Amino acid sequence: MKSNTLHLWHQLCLLLTAVVFIGTTGPLAAASGGRKILALELSADRLTANVTVPAGVESVTVQRFQRDGGWQKVRTKTAVAGVMKFKLPAAGPEIRWRAIGQVVRGTVSHDKFPATFYKGKSRFDAVKSGSRIGAPGILLKDMTGGEGGNLSAPEEADIWKVDGDTVYFFNQLRGLQVLDLADPADPRITASLRLPAVGQDLYLLPGSSKARTVVLLTEGWSNHGGSWTRINLVKVNAGKAEITSTQDVPGSLADSRLAGNRLILATTEWNDYYNATDWSSRSRLSEWLLAADSVPQAAGETLVEGDGPLIASGPDWLALAVNPNGRWDVSDVTVFAIRPNGLIRMARPFRTAGAVTGKFAMQWSGNVLTTISEKNMDESGWSPTTILENFRVWAPEVVRPAVIDPAGDRLGRLKLAKGESLFATRFAGDKAYVVTFLQTDPLFVIDLSDPKDPVVAGHLEVPGWSSHLEPLGDLLFAVGWESETVAASIFDVSNPASPKLLRRVSLGTPGTYSEALWDEQALKVLPHAGLAMIPLSTYDGKTGQSTSVVQLLDIDLTARDLRLRGKISHAFDARRADLIGETVVSISQRVLVAAGVADRDAPAVLSEVTLAWPVDRVLEANGHLLQIEDGGWYGGGGATVRVSPADAPEQILAETDLGEGTVRAADLRDGKLFILREIASTQSVLYWSPVTGKSGANKLALDIYDCQSALAPVLLGSCSLKSGSGAQLAVDHLLWPQPNRPAVVLDYRMSYWYGWDKRQMTDPVVTLSAAARPLKVGIDFQPYGVPEKAPRLILFDTTLPNAPEVGEPVDLGAAGLSLNGVGEAADGRIVIGTYRLNDADFGKAFQSARVVEVESSGLPVIRPLIDLPGELIAVSELDRKGFLAFTQVSGDRSTTLQASACDGFEAFLIDSFHAPAYAAATAGGRRVFVATKAGVERKILGEDGSFHSEPMLDVGYTPDSLRCVGGILIGAKWNALFAADVDGDSVKKWRFPAWNLGLERVIPASNGDLLVPFGDYGAERLKR
């Protein structure tokens, strides 16, 4: 084998030498020079190419790139200076073309040196190579893994980019936001593009004009499990941000890089969720050329079997690691050369001994690929081991022998830290740094100078572990974990054999965490400023409170030390920070904070800009929108109403604090805003208070605000009462039987005891109608969901808005009666859907309705229950004379929908019809709407007492929920919403990135538009 290898190499050397010395028999002769890429322009039909040929080129070769075979010759012609035309074979748009010119070097002169210099031997046999190269290679161009040239590494996407004093932020809660920080004391949002909940990866294309192009990478999903990635090019100019072009790419986004104007996307595609016979997947590495005001142009792609693609890159190389199908314990790594014409695959995929889990665990340098992986299992079971491997990967420009090395492509391997889990890796020159954790918690320094024999140069045992390493010359800055909190460290690695921990500082109390522990882009290290910034959040288990800050750290490269400095407080989890001039700008998804750091021990907050806020309800008042945040312990926000222009929900004009507690209902009537708040003594009042026995202070408060006299609502009056433990609103809105008497209905059912017997413990609450209940401990064997208290009606009197009153709670029935959530009120009457479980037949219930008479003053009158043929789903035409009750009976094979006439005391079945089992249904007026596969089925109740079919509404899907409100039918499925007039045939449809739309809070505006709250993602006004 050895003799064959030498023989082949000898023949190659002879061949190359012969090529070089052709025509050199005389003292002066023409000689071929180097090769150069020539300008090539394809025709529109891609069947011809025009190549611009400069003087000094002797031949032109046109090549095309094949994914499996690399660059292959198509045509070669003798060069003619000017423009040469080549005919091309038919090929798809994904095929790349290039033209190579062979340059005439001119004449070879032997006048430079004495003639005796040129009389020596000029042909040589193969000799043993040096350890770094491994086998001879002739380098045609200096592109061998970052060892030459001034190329910069491809850029990685982030949630924001800072360009001078302008910040571009892809906010998951809102979309693109552009902020001007020329005056840090007065930052301003200058442009925005609503695009929430679809991604956060952003690039800023190079440019210097006022108009800039931002690249936003977003994701979309089909109803059948498929996904795609969308490239959005956004033009930002003159206070506007608008999408100028888009391009969809198959698969979900996993990683990306931007090299100049070439976008490289790594996406994963799974087999069709519903029709797949196997769960195989593949990853797609696609290239796209980007330019302002142009559609992204496809520039090549590579398909790799496997998923979870992970990119590592350097100035002239890119590595892609995937999990091969069916394997999570190893990785397949493919290396590409980055060239002006795109990516060139340099070798077949290499399978690593373990799984590569991070982008800092791969490097290509000096024609060697180095990977660091973790192998978790061996013959004895779980036994994590870190494995470093070196593979031979030649640059495309290197001419090399057919047989590179007798040992194959794998040059060397190093196993270390058996029994330890791999936490951090980083390369710096010919050194690799590795951090593991479990038993001895070491930092390893690995010498890579001999790729065939990587060795541990030294190691240091330290407590805790590091999750990210940042080389700073012969220092190593690290962020990690120790003693249940985030820690920062600085190591001296000037002597690889003896690394030293110079300083470690704890960044918070136990329970502190940081996004930088899993995403190093959250950490900002500025060596030139001697500054590091890291976002921190701390949860206090005793108080239930969370705090968020950006911690400043001094990194003194001269003194080789690390020092803790001041903090910049955030109301919400900070995610990024940077230094703009003398100001630290830090950002969360809710707020941007600018702070002066002249004194790093005491940063001075200069300004705060609100970027996003939750919207749980939207109301329209006097040409404005009232955006209501419910508040509560989760998320850290308080109950607030914010005022915006009716057509610009993101432009907040004023805001009002609604006080403690959580908003449970809100309504706007006659220029007044009515807010129902629940004020709890514990965090989770609705469900756990009967168990904890700590809800004695729970109460409901009704607040009345004037919305006519000022831009911001002004509080007029308030009243409250104790609601009792376990109380929850049975109907999610205020009921108005009289203009001055709003009502709420309370239920006392436990919602979260799935499959458990209910346990009753002490309940010390004193209600308005009874003294303290006696202590009751033990197990109640009532069926699941049976309330322990009777449902109650609470009436308010708002005749005097400055002094509203609350009446005595009224029981709506005996304990054991449950409410189904349906309630309507009008003309002095309230109708509430009720049921009682049938103990003799599990799963069935007696359905009924409770009617309550309410006059403008005095006590309410509770009428007897009205038996209903099914569960109440809607009430229409309600007045003192009666109402129409629409009910349903669900079965395994079909659902029966019914209409009954009620006189206030009895229900008389009018007609019924069958619908698909478990189909969503609702009613409005005398029409019933049912979701089917074909759309929305419509039935109208005629004067003859029968249901009559109307044309089907085609909405394009089967809605999961339907609702009639204000004469409009609305329906939703996942992220899709539609609307149609109850008596109309025209359908308006929308799709959103936010999923599971809650129809109960969608309301019509005065002109018929829909006002939709999206919670954390804000609000939208949908034009109809």
Range-by-range predicted roles:
Residues 1-2, 30:
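Initiator methionine at the very start of the polypeptide chain
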Residues 2-13:
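Bacterial N-terminal signal peptides that target proteins for export
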Residues 13-24:
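Bacterial N-terminal signal peptides
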Residues 96-1024:
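Beta-sheet-rich non-transmembrane sensory/scaffold domains
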